[in-house]
């Protein structure tokens, strides 16, 4: 299903097996999303919000993970508030995906009028100075759209990704990501291809919030709890001679607009130790996500790795027991 260019770049390829009847359901889903993407957002967003909330009630394991994460990160919020955040998260997810599909099908000129950049001058200055850049991007639902927009404007982009479980969805999703150019690097291939791309002038896209286990990670504060955070961005900025720029997209289903927030480069990381780097990474996530928690992918096992002697929260039977 895939080929490699220069032993580093992942290029999705159509496989003849995708025509098999076992994948027809997946193709129907792809066709449905394409049709929805061509529908004006003022009509599709309310429908997608209702469908998303409904799916969020059915997906009990995903909902449980999200509620556990929120209970540890925001213990000061009431149960009703956390439930509302999860509902809005599930509403936001299909809305953001539909905008991504619309961008791929109709092109950037159709969605640019609904995109607001905050801090665009930071990006423009680095482009003028021909600087190497790695964007630090918390895992939000609209995470791919800013990279696609920058690629559509001629900026070479490179990102790492995990394969989807369904090969048809994996093929379509990554084809959409590469719609306007750029490079994709499979995480299974390691970090070196990504480093090579950034050194060659591609702007990197790095998601800082996944749990990579205890090895090489630092236990640092994350909202009201703590998280095993890999301080790799500090090494990457040195090896690539790149500046690290925090970025976060926010999709508003009521206004049908995407706001892309860009914060000043994290130049303070150059001389920082691993613990400080890890904490600064989490601080940027908190700054972006705190005001708009529904934008974040709380369904991930963000807090899987715990300190010795502490039970993984998702295995605790006292936290949101399944019925």
Question: What do these predicted ranges mean?
Answer:
Residues 2-137, 170-172, 181, 323:
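Membrane-anchoring hydrophobic helices of lipid-metabolizing enzymes
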Residues 2-19, 83-87, 124-128, 152, ...:
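Non-catalytic C-terminal accessory region of glycerolipid acyltransferases
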Residues 116, 185, 263:
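General small-molecule cofactor/ligand-binding pocket signal
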Residues 129-188, 214-221, 225, 255:
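Catalytic core of membrane glycerolipid acyltransferases/transacylases, capturing the structured
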Residues 31, 65, 121, 145, ...:
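Short Gly/charged-rich anion-binding patches and loops
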């Amino acid at each position: 299903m895939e080929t490699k260019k220069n032993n580093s770049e992942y290029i999705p390829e159509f496989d003849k097996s995708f025509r098999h009847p076992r994948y027809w359901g997946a193709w129907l889903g792809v066709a449905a999303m394409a049709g929805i993407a061509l529908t004006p957002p003022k009509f599709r967003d309310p429908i997608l919000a209702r469908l998303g909330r409904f799916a969020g009630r059915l997906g009990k394991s995903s909902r449980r993970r999200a509620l556990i994460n929120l209970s540890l990160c925001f213990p000061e919020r009431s149960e009703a508030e956390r439930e509302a955040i999860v509902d809005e998260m599930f509403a936001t997810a299909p809305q953001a995906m539909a905008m991504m599909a619309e961008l791929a099908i109709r092109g950037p000129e159709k969605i640019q009028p609904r995109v607001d950049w905050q801090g665009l001058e930071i990006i423009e200055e680095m482009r003028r100075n021909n600087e190497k850049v790695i964007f630090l991007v918390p895992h939000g639902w609209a995470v791919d759209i800013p990279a696609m927009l920058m690629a559509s404007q001629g900026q070479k982009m490179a990102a790492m990704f995990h394969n989807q479980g369904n090969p048809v969805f994996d093929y379509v999703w990554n084809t959409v990501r590469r719609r306007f150019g750029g490079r994709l690097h499979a995480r299974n291939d390691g970090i070196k291809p990504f480093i090579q791309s950034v050194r060659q002038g591609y702007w990197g896209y790095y998601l800082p919030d996944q749990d990579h286990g205890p090895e090489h990670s630092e236990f640092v504060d994350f909202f009201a709890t703590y998280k095993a955070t890999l301080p790799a961005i500090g090494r990457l900025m040195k090896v690539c001679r790149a500046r690290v720029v925090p970025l976060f997209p926010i999709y508003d289903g009521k206004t049908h607009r995407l706001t892309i927030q860009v914060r000043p480069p994290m130049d303070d990381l150059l001389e920082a130790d691993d613990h400080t780097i890890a904490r600064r990474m989490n601080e940027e996530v908190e700054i972006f996500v705190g005001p708009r928690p529904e934008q974040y992918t709380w369904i991930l096992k963000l807090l899987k790795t715990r300190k010795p002697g502490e039970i993984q929260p998702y295995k605790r039977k006292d936290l949101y027991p399944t019925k």
